[in-house]
């Protein structure tokens, strides 16, 4: 599956990454190779394979929440493109 340069640019914009023209071309090739590999997995016959979440028995170990010191709000919000009333402001995606 070929990834176009415009798709790489769109993904980079979403991730707030900036690439040179050469990096965009390299990323398009690399992402195309990755998607080709993932598509190969669709060829596997998994009809008789029992669905699992983990290949080994595993369970979550929960702990009590503890309030710990963190970064000041102002410092955290310095990297946010949009803020409002001391919070992150994100585009509305649900009507």
UniProtKB/Swiss-Prot annotation:
Q: Name one GO biological process term.
A: translation
Decide whether keyword Ligase is in the record: yes
Alphabetized InterPro entries for the sequence = Asp/Glu-ADT_sf_sub_c (IPR036113), GatC (IPR003837)
Name the reaction it catalyses.
Answer: L-glutamyl-tRNA(Gln) + L-glutamine + ATP + H2O = L-glutaminyl-tRNA(Gln) + L-glutamate + ADP + phosphate + H(+); L-aspartyl-tRNA(Asn) + L-glutamine + ATP + H2O = L-asparaginyl-tRNA(Asn) + L-glutamate + ADP + phosphate + 2 H(+)
Q: Which residues constitute the signal peptide according to the record?
A: none
Into which family does the record put it?
Belongs to the GatC family.
**Mind telling me which HAMAP family this protein's record contains?**
GatC
Give the function comment from the record.
Answer: Allows the formation of correctly charged Asn-tRNA(Asn) or Gln-tRNA(Gln) through the transamidation of misacylated Asp-tRNA(Asn) or Glu-tRNA(Gln) in organisms which lack either or both of asparaginyl-tRNA or glutaminyl-tRNA synthetases. The reaction takes place in the presence of glutamine and ATP through an activated phospho-Asp-tRNA(Asn) or phospho-Glu-tRNA(Gln).
- Please give the subunit comment from the record: Heterotrimer of A, B and C subunits.
Would you tell me the protein name for this molecule?
A: Aspartyl/glutamyl-tRNA(Asn/Gln) amidotransferase subunit C
Its gene is: gatC
